[in-house]
A protein has these predicted regions:
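Short aromatic/hydrophobic "clamp" motif used to bind/position activated sugar donors
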Residues: 86
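Glycine-rich, basic loop-to-helix element that forms the pyrophosphate-binding segment
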Residues: 64-81
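A short, conserved alpha-helix in the catalytic core of glycosyltransferases
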Residues: 160-163, 167-171, 178-211
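N-proximal low-complexity "stem/linker" segments adjacent to membrane-targeting elements
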Residues: 1-24
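Non-catalytic, C-terminal membrane-associated alpha-helical segments of glycosyltransferases
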Residues: 229-233, 247-305
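Short, flexible, basic/aromatic active-site loop/helix in glycosyltransferases
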Residues: 134-154
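Short, acidic, metal-binding catalytic loop of nucleotide-sugar glycosyltransferases
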Residues: 22-32
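Conserved donor NDP-sugar-binding/catalytic core segment of glycosyltransferases
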Residues: 98-130
Length: 305
């Protein structure tokens, strides 16, 4: 089974991190891997990548004429892949050496049409003590209560997800209006795609936590204002997904909210009462504030969608 790993990049200041991502893919224990790199409308960056890697036999390089965003960039990559499976990783991530091998194990051991793994944090400037693990998803890291091994979920994170190539092609790829592009705030492009996949095939993404990818959490991603803004637009995006795809598109978020309020919050309160701690208190406060902020974004989405 051949795997095509797609890396999209667009900012020159991220070049060192892009190199880390690229080398982590090159260091995989699984051999049958090709790499497709898409530079999103940055000619200077494209020339730099071409100068350093243009002659690499395992790498195909493409540059978009304009900055079209992550979703459209990944769609453009589909024109160049030749593998049976397309695996996606971001330019600020580092794959464990067994990442591809563990994804392939899912396809070879099950009838999965999509597979994804666990995102682990690489705290660039230290772990923020106020951020509860239940909300690690805001910084692109697998959170407490996500899923059990082998469970079929709607989607894993966009930097650790894969699809059978024919499935991606039959779905016409990602919705280009959703996902990162400059300051655009409609997030979660993998959510929209996987919601359509569930409607079309009745299937989700098989979760294998042993397929690990580390995500670099830069200092600015742990800034409280940034986190609250991201939480707001995540809530907005969940409502947008319901409108764009179906009312069931945010079912997993509803189930997580129930688990959060009925299991995790009571557990945290008990722990705080029995063993008082300032970090525990800060995390509990942040948990409530983020939950309310996401709800506010969702309500705003109701007005817009």
């Amino acid at each position: 089974m051949k795997v095509s790993v797609v890396i999209c990049t667009y900012a020159e200041e991220m070049y060192g991190h892009f190199e880390d991502a690229l080398e982590s893919v090159r260091g995989q224990t699984y051999d049958d891997v090709e790499i497709v790199v898409v530079v999103d409308g940055n000619e200077d960056l494209y020339e730099r990548v071409r100068s350093d890697h243009g002659g690499d036999e395992d790498l195909t390089l493409h540059c978009n004429e304009d900055n079209v965003g992550l979703s459209a960039s990944r769609n453009n990559a589909l024109e160049f892949v030749t593998g049976d499976v397309v695996a996606l990783i971001d330019d600020d991530a580092v794959a464990d050496e067994r990442w591809v091998e563990e994804l392939v194990a899912v396809y070879e051991g099950t009838d999965a049409i999509a597979a994804g793994g666990r995102m682990t944090p690489i705290w660039v400037d230290g772990r923020p003590g106020f951020l509860p693990e239940e909300f690690y998803w805001l910084v692109g890291v697998t959170h407490r209560g996500f899923a059990d091994p082998g469970e079929e979920v709607r989607n894993t994170f966009g930097s650790n997800i894969s699809f059978r190539t024919e499935v991606l092609e039959e779905l016409d790829g990602f919705e280009a209006e959703v996902g990162r592009q400059g300051e655009k705030n409609l997030q979660a492009h993998e959510t929209e795609l996987c919601a359509r996949m569930r409607e079309e095939y009745g299937r989700g993404v098989v979760y294998n936590p042993d397929a690990e990818v580390g995500h670099k959490v830069f200092e600015w991603r742990t800034d409280k204002q940034w986190l609250f803004e991201r939480a707001f637009w995540q809530g907005y995006s969940k409502r947008a997904m319901e409108s764009l795809v179906s009312a069931d598109a945010s079912q997993e978020e509803s189930e997580f909210l129930e688990q959060l309020l009925t299991e995790f919050v009571p557990s945290r309160v008990r722990s705080l009462v029995t063993e008082p701690d300032t970090e525990k208190a800060a995390q509990l406060v942040t948990l409530f504030v983020l939950t309310g902020t996401i709800g506010s974004g969702y309500l705003y989405g109701l007005l817009e969608w």
